[in-house]
């Protein structure tokens, strides 16, 4: 469709047609309409712009149709040549030209831990940016629920959230935050700004329940012992809605991590003064090491002394 004539230009044309024919009385509506259409009919408009439209250079790649005749340059063998592995099929991606494969001559190095927890990473500079934008309230405790719902780590929920220390130099906002794990630099920056950080054990399912409102957040573990059963049941019965409790760690590595005060773990209160967070290794004592001598060696040394006394 040709482009429309601008209104200003059409008005000028109509005015020119009326002034050019003074013999026709202006009171006749038929004659005035005829003169208007006559003025418009003499206007010539070019529609050749439609024929000159094209894509930018490099925006369009012509489709190559192979095996459609010799004039295309890709007929018969379709650019593959005649016979051979490359014409009939393709070389395997791991083939190295016939030499001894590097994986055979040098062996496999390293491994990928299939059981490692997949953590969502959160840096301090991103946290400060979200707080300054008003997307996270620093006056309230920041839990994984607030972090996930704010969209700061994306929409996908993984096995936990790890706080990292990039941007620690400019982080000056005191916050109370709970995450799955935290680096030493992030812990130092949070506490230097007057905030508090706690690391707690989560799973992918427990994080989903937190976001959906099916669990209540707490930084205290479930008490163990028969004396606590009635109290916990009474609290659960007093609530109108049934909630899932947050899980506690069961593997040795997780228990030792959250027992460590250096990680600000929520199980660190279980340690006695001077006790190691490890479940296996104990803190060495400051006294001298007592040498244990086997009884048979003591007996053998005594008989040797008696025999030497008899000889001399």
Curated annotation (Swiss-Prot):
TM annotation in the entry: none
One GO cellular component, as annotated: mitochondrial large ribosomal subunit
Domain of life per record: Eukaryota
Comp. bias regions, Gly residues: 70-82
Annotated segments matching region Disordered: 63-89
Xref: Pfam families: Ribosomal_L27A (PF00828)
Molecular function in Gene Ontology: structural constituent of ribosome
GO biological process, one term: translation
Entry keyword set: Mitochondrion, Ribonucleoprotein, Ribosomal protein
Record localization: Mitochondrion
Subunit organization: Component of the mitochondrial large ribosomal subunit (mt-LSU). Mature N.crassa 74S mitochondrial ribosomes consist of a small (37S) and a large (54S) subunit. The 37S small subunit contains a 16S ribosomal RNA (16S mt-rRNA) and 32 different proteins. The 54S large subunit contains a 23S rRNA (23S mt-rRNA) and 42 different proteins.
Membership in a protein family: Belongs to the universal ribosomal protein uL15 family.
Role of this protein: Component of the mitochondrial ribosome (mitoribosome), a dedicated translation machinery responsible for the synthesis of mitochondrial genome-encoded proteins, including at least some of the essential transmembrane subunits of the mitochondrial respiratory chain. The mitoribosomes are attached to the mitochondrial inner membrane and translation products are cotranslationally integrated into the membrane.
Protein name per its UniProtKB record: Large ribosomal subunit protein uL15m
Species in which this protein is naturally found: Neurospora crassa (strain ATCC 24698 / 74-OR23-1A / CBS 708.71 / DSM 1257 / FGSC 987)
